[in-house]
């Protein structure tokens, strides 16, 4: 019999709540094609170009979440406040994602891949210009809308439009009231933190699945990466980077922070009061979780 003191995990609850949708977001045919060396350079280039724009939205959202965090005024006596830990994680994420963009550029140059939307292969020079909406993947448009509301619920994406199915729903889910969360809301940063954890966890699991498929192919003695349709960019460079133990530790660190913070809110509550608090938290995040998974699923190009 489970102990009555067993800690409830919000992140594990979310992962198990939408299993089929999560699977479709992390085990897509695009990933399998990449793992098997069948992904053409033009399709990989399109995805990389969109993922680079995702990085830019991620950076803006991280800044918004940092600005919204109310850091403690008192010096901690033991463990640092969850808000301080979250700020540390976001700062670490910003450093990592800038390194990631430089990695994109380096690999794209070495494998002759395009990382600018509308430009299939690296040009000698290109002037900065606005990206045509129709060239963005549906998942990127949804993620830009999701990120626009992080840490600032009254804000909606200036790029939103009824032309793209689901964007209005995304904005309504990730936008609460014009005044933002109530000052008495438990963990007012929770939705923003879960957005970052959710997108990073999907990325980790997606590329870890691709790595497992690539290893199956390698163990069967099939062709070397140099003969892959993308020249080996995914199997030699990207897949190992995005399925590393270091990346897994980084993602797990935020998941643990979230679960520990929620456990702190539930601590001392029993019976109906504890269950009501759980339901209040789930009411804030479950719809957003599903919407995030839909965006992640639609971020992969058709192959």
Where are these regions (language model features)?
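Acidic, low-complexity proline/glycine-rich segments
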Residues: 2-31, 246-253
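Short alpha-helical hairpin
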Residues: 15-39, 263-272
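Alpha-helical bundle segments that constitute or directly flank the non-heme di-iron/ferroxidase center
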Residues: 19-24, 39-69, 96, 194-205
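Amphipathic, well-ordered alpha-helical segments in soluble domains
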Residues: 26, 54-61, 100-103, 169, ...
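Helix-loop segments that flank and shape redox-cofactor active sites
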Residues: 29-42, 59-88, 185, 216
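Active-site-proximal alpha-helical scaffolds that flank and shape metal-associated catalytic sites
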Residues: 80-250, 294
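Extended, basic/helix-rich recognition subdomains
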Residues: 235, 239-281
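A cross-kingdom marker for long, charged
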Residues: 264-272, 277, 283-303
């Amino acid at each position: 019999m489970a102990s009555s003191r067993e800690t409830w995990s919000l992140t594990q609850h979310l992962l198990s709540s939408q299993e089929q949708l999560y699977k479709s977001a992390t085990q897509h045919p695009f990933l399998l094609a990449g793992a098997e060396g069948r992904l053409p350079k033009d399709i990989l280039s399109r995805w990389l170009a969109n993922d680079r724009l995702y990085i830019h939205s991620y950076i803006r959202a991280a800044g918004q979440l940092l600005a919204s965090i109310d850091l403690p005024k008192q010096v901690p006596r033991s463990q640092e406040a969850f808000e301080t830990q979250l700020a540390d994680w976001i700062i670490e994420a910003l450093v990592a994602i800038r390194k990631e963009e430089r990695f994109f550029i380096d690999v794209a140059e070495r494998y002759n891949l395009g990382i600018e939307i509308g430009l299939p292969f690296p040009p000698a020079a290109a002037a900065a210009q606005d990206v045509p909406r129709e060239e963005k993947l549906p998942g990127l448009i949804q993620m830009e809308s999701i990120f626009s509301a992080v840490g600032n619920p009254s804000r909606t994406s200036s790029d939103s439009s009824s032309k793209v199915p689901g964007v209005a729903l995304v904005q309504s889910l990730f936008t609460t009231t014009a005044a933002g969360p109530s000052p008495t809301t438990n963990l007012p940063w929770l939705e923003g933190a879960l957005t970052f954890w959710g997108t990073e966890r999907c990325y980790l699991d997606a590329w870890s699945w691709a790595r497992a498929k690539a290893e199956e192919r390698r163990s069967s003695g099939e062709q070397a990466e140099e003969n892959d349709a993308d020249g080996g960019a995914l199997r030699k460079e990207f897949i190992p980077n995005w399925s590393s133990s270091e990346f897994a530790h980084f993602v797990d660190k935020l998941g643990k922070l979230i679960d520990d913070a929620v456990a702190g809110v539930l601590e001392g509550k029993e019976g109906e009061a504890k269950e009501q608090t759980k339901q209040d938290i789930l009411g804030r995040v479950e719809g957003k979780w599903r919407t995030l998974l839909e965006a992640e699923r639609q971020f992969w190009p058709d192959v």
